[in-house]
């Protein structure tokens, strides 16, 4: 041994065990402070031995061998060995101070070999050397079902398989072997670094205690403790699964509505060109269109404002009354007014518009419906109007059109400020600003759609009769955003021509959330107590993104509830678990299952009967994946029992012994021993002054604290 320091104890620690149990990894973790990744741990095993001469070659390895244990300076020298049974290891065993007998927690055969093969071999060459039983790869006791761990085995040879639950050695099984052999038991993991330093510190203690029994005159070893108890390893809390949202199709839906307009209710005439559009979208993008379409065309008065851009000709009270009538789909109050208005043209005092009128047209189903016709002034060219409409629907412009001045003039008259800013960024070549402006425009339009169409109910052309009320909607947006609605309004169903559609089994709260998604591609906050109806409706309409958004909102609500001291989050998860699977909300079901597993003890105390009412597969999953797992709870109870017994042993007795010591042979100590021997059936009693460090390393007559940890 090189570079011995004065007043330093040299401890030779021999590491033995079957091949591929993790001996060399354990030594490298301690001697070289080497941390390994999961991919490195799962590489194909190549038998190796860590060379002992590294203490002489590498200074940092030598310095890491120095350690202070219980105020004793120690230099720990680790000896690696081959795991083959037929190898001759007598040289490695020579002058060893302690032996680590290793096995793999994922290989029960390696534990059996510890008792059958390795322990007899150690005792043959080292009859008095202390032994520690070490379980390696402790991390695989909980990682064997981890998705990251399992993914490494999918693309490998079929002859290489991942660890299964049946392969695992539980702590009580290994401790039973340690108790049978009369040795201490520890567990380690070079992946999590659990127990690495602890096992070597306690191996040093075991070696120093054995050395103290042989060299009783060495005062520096008096305070060395017995190997300490190892706190059980608690697996990390399972991470809640993340919710993955289906890709948004909102922009594609709006582009398709622009490219193939259906259920249009307004026609714009610019020169010799006509453009079909939808009043709700035009009003959401442009305040001037909103004011135009909100006019009461049956009124006989002319516009009151002298401003060219103003088209509000009625008082605010009359406008509010007409908005209420619009929201109930009474565009024209009476049949007489309808007859007067259809075909009648109203001239407008605005630079962008000449006149507006309402006429009757036949839709694709042959049903007559009112159509608003707006004639544009010559200041807005057909090409500029086409670009403005394209921007309103899609948020983008045609790059092939280069006359930006015409578009700018039309945008000013139509009050499209976002389009003006986009044109400015195009002229200055600020593409990144252009992208931000488009994103901001889409947010503004969606917010305006929600306000105009959902809150005020303007420009609707269909009404849904629900269980607790009626809600207006717009066929064009429903058709573009939902394939089921598209089939209903476009096919040979009676709903395609109906003004009122009966929708049984749906309440107004649920349908409003559905419309929020269809119009804005977002879902407002949802209570976990009221989400099932919306999940059922979204699944019925084949809206997977809506299902994902509802899952995300409900999980946010459950996370908020879980921070409270009550059991409301657990109760809601238990209530949602199985219905979520029924409605294909699998991500929410997985999150609820994870939350129930983490709070399994609270769940059983709260409502054990509800757990028994779950589907047997769900009950089995909860029992299998509960956290903390059963083996940890058993190990923790054993650890607490050992600590309690250790405290009782170290606690001084309350009864004070009489001091009967005397001079030489005239003392009463011999009589006291004789009486104690008689009272204990011939067994020698331990005096109260005996310290834990003076007791043997392992007492096979005791059951816990003195045995395997």
Predicted features by range, described:
Residues 438-477, 487, 498-508, 530-533, ...:
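BTB/POZ-protein C-terminal extensions
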Residues 1-211, 247, 259:
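TRAFAC-class small GTPase G-domain
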Residues 267-269, 273-276, 282-416, 463-472, ...:
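Canonical BTB/POZ domain core
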Residues 8-13, 18, 24-25, 61-66, ...:
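Beta-strand-rich binding-surface signature
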Residues 7-12, 29-63, 75-85, 112-116, ...:
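Eukaryotic beta-rich interaction modules
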Residues 37-47, 52-55, 217-261, 297-364, ...:
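Long, low-complexity intrinsically disordered regulatory regions
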């Amino acid at each position: 041994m090189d570079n011995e320091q004065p007043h330093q104890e040299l401890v030779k620690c021999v590491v033995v065990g079957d091949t591929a149990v993790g001996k060399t990894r354990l030594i490298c973790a301690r001697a070289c402070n080497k941390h390994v990744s999961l991919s490195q741990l799962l590489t194909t095993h190549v038998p190796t031995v860590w060379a002992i001469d590294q203490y002489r070659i590498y200074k940092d390895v030598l310095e890491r061998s120095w350690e202070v244990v219980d105020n004793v300076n120690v230099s720990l020298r680790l000896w690696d060995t081959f795991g083959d049974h037929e190898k001759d290891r007598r040289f490695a065993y020579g002058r060893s101070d302690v032996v680590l007998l290793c096995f793999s927690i994922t290989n029960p055969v390696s534990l059996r070999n510890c008792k059958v093969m390795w322990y007899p071999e150690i005792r043959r060459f080292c009859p008095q050397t202390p032994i520690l039983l070490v379980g390696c790869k402790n991390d695989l006791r909980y990682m064997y079902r981890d998705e990251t761990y399992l993914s490494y085995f999918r693309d490998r040879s079929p002859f290489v398989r991942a660890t299964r639950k049946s392969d695992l050695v539980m702590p009580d099984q290994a401790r039973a072997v340690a108790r049978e052999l009369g040795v201490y038991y520890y567990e380690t993991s070079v992946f999590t670094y659990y127990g690495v330093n602890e096992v070597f510190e306690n191996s040093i203690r075991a070696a120093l205690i054995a050395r103290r029994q042989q060299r009783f005159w060495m005062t520096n070893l008096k305070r060395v403790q017995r190997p300490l108890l190892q706190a059980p390893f608690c697996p990390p809390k399972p991470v809640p699964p993340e919710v993955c949202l289906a890709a948004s199709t909102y922009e594609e839906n709006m582009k398709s509505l622009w490219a193939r307009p259906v259920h249009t209710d307004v026609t714009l005439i610019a020169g010799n060109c006509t453009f079909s559009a939808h009043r709700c979208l035009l009003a959401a993008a442009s305040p001037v269109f909103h004011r135009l379409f909100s006019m009461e065309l049956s009124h006989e008065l002319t516009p009151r404002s002298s401003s060219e851009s103003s088209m509000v000709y009625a008082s605010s009270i009359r406008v509010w009354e007409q908005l209420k009538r619009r929201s109930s789909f009474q565009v024209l109050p009476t049949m007489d007014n309808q007859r007067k208005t259809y075909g009648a043209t109203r001239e407008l005092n605005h630079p962008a518009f000449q006149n507006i009128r309402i006429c009757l047209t036949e839709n694709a189903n042959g049903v007559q419906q009112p159509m608003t016709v707006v004639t544009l002034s010559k200041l807005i060219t057909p090409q500029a109007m086409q670009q403005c409409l394209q921007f309103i629907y899609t948020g983008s412009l045609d790059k092939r059109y280069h006359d930006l001045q015409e578009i700018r003039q039309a945008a000013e008259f139509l009050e499209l400020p976002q389009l003006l800013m986009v044109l400015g960024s195009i002229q200055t070549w600020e593409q990144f600003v252009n992208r931000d402006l488009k994103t901001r425009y889409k947010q503004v339009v969606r917010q305006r759609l929600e306000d105009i169409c959902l809150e005020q109910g303007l420009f609707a052309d269909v009404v849904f009769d629900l269980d607790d009320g009626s809600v207006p909607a717009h066929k064009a947006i429903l058709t573009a955003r939902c394939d089921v609605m598209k089939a209903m309004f476009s096919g040979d169903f009676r709903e395609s021509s109906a003004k009122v559609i009966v929708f049984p089994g749906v309440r107004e709260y649920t349908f409003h959330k559905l419309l929020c998604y269809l119009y804005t591609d977002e879902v407002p906050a949802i209570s976990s107590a009221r989400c099932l109806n919306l999940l059922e409706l979204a699944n019925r309409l084949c809206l997977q993104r809506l299902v994902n958004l509802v899952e995300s909102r409900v999980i946010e609500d459950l996370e908020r509830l879980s921070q409270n001291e009550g059991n409301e989050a657990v109760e809601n998860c238990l209530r949602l678990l199985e219905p979520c699977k029924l409605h294909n909300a699998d991500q929410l079901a997985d999150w609820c299952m994870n939350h129930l597993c983490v709070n399994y003890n609270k769940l059983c105390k709260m409502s054990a009967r509800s757990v028994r009412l779950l589907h047997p597969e769900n009950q089995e999953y909860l029992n299998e994946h509960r956290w903390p797992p059963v083996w940890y709870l058993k190990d923790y109870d054993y650890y607490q029992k050992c600590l309690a017994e250790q405290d009782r042993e170290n606690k001084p007795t309350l009864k004070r012994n009489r001091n009967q010591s005397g001079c030489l042979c005239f003392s009463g100590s011999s009589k006291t021993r004789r009486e104690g021997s008689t009272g204990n059936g011939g067994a020698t009693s331990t005096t109260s002054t005996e310290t834990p460090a003076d007791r043997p390393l392992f007492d096979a007559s005791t059951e816990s604290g003195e045995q395997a940890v």
